[in-house]
């Protein structure tokens, strides 16, 4: 899974009833906003398509996109999604862009509405099957265990030209490598021991 992923907000959906069907309906009704700043990125459209194709409940996947674009590019044309209620798009000419923090703040201020969860990504990702339910289940289980979790990871690599070949299918985490001479810390990716046997996230010190 491309887990440069952060769930940063949680609202409780009240549902006090029994039965498998009720649980499934409750799960499918929980919405998740994919928080995507995109700067002239040819991988934006493939990222959107892969997210929807691999979601267990694609109707509950919403998109908040800050599109910093050049109209001459064409590869990030979102016209096919402009009438889709799941998509909220803020467009600006790439010459007006002010950097990643500005784009993320713009999404927070104008595109984040009443979704139950937020999944903060870059605009170049691939997804595993049922990624939406996996993340929500992990989050909710941690809440039930008494935590107030943020779920994240260090994104493993993929090659957009050959994908799905050459994908790195091992999840990574953020590790401290050293301090720079001027005092800031250098973060690098590292493997997660025994990840094949894990059923839930592990505690971490750093968030990518």
Predicted regions and their residues:
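Catalytic cores of eukaryotic secretory-pathway lumenal/extracellular enzymes that build
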Residues: 29-208
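Acidic, Ala/Val/Gly-enriched low-complexity intrinsically disordered segments
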Residues: 6, 14-16, 24
């Amino acid at each position: 899974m491309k887990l440069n992923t952060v769930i940063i907000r949680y609202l409780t959906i009240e549902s006090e009833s029994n039965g498998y069907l009720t649980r499934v309906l409750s799960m499918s009704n929980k919405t998740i906003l994919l928080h995507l700043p995109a700067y002239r990125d040819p991988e934006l459209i493939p990222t959107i398509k892969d997210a929807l194709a691999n979601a267990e409940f694609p109707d509950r996947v919403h998109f908040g996109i800050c599109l910093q674009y050049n109209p001459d590019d064409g590869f990030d044309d979102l016209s096919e999604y402009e009438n889709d209620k799941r998509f909220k798009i803020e467009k600006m000419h790439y010459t007006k862009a002010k950097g990643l923090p500005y784009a993320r703040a713009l999404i927070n201020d104008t595109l984040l509405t009443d979704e139950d969860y937020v999944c903060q990504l870059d605009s170049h990702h691939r997804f595993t099957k049922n990624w939406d339910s996996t993340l929500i289940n992990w989050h909710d289980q941690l809440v039930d265990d008494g935590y107030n979790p943020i779920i994240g990871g260090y994104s493993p690599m993929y090659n957009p030209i050959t994908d799905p070949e050459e994908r790195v299918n091992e999840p990574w985490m953020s590790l401290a490598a050293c301090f720079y001479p001027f005092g800031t810390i250098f973060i690098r990716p590292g493997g997660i021991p025994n990840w094949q046997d894990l059923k839930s996230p592990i505690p971490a010190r750093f968030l990518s």
